[in-house]
Amino acid sequence: MAIHSLKDTNKTDLFRVMIYGKPGIGKTSAARFLKGKTLVVPFDNSEKVLSGTNIDAEEFDKANPSKELTRLLKELPGVLDGYSNLVLDNVSSLEKSWFIEQGRNSKSGIRNELQDYSGWTNYFIRVIDAFYKLPVNILVTAWEDQYEITSMTGQQFNQYSPQLRASVRSTFMGLTDVVGRMMLNPDTQKRGVILEGDDGIFAKNRLDSRKASPIETLFDWGESDDKDASAE
């Protein structure tokens, strides 16, 4: 057995955070507010919005995601020294690129085959698990979508959550410390992140007691007061 004491463990060390929202809401730009040196892996090649910042970006060939992910997971452990944060920018885009790649490699050259769907479930969880084992803080972004859920009372709702196939979405969100929906307040034009979920929005926060946060202070863990996210 490998027993270790949790007495001096800080639950915010090596955090794993996902923020999701509609395209253009500012998910990638949230990397500006991470503390320490940051490396971005741009699955959707949108890293140019971070131009002028002291943030590094890895090149990613979205036409060949399987090969690129194999390369990254082999090379990253050797280049992360000095980095505090890793940003996996847009796993929704990664999912789409992977299925396009599989369709291209199919017998028809375009259509996905049945085994692709079960293959993605195993592949994606293994990839995320490998990323999550890296000794840095990790921020993941995704697009949003609405999915039908059934409450404990039997009522059905459409709930916003990260745009990923159902076969991986729940497991992925379970592995992640914080899942928040980024929103824009139409009155103030300020961006915030919802950190407490309900029937209409999936969100969770197991790092502190905040239910919402302005994007600028999202990574200031330990705040006991619920700040106005300016997103409701």
Q: Which ranges hold each PLM region?
A:
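P-loop NTPase motor core
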Residues: N85, N90-S170
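Short, well-ordered beta-strand core segments
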Residues: T38-V40, I138, V179-R181
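Residues that form or immediately flank small-molecule/cofactor binding pockets and catalytic motifs
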Residues: N45, K62-N64, W143, L184, ...
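Conserved GTP-binding G-domain of TRAFAC-class P-loop NTPases and closely related GTPase folds
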Residues: A130, Q146-E232
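Structured loop/turn residues at beta-strand edges in well-structured enzyme cores
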Residues: D81, L134, G174
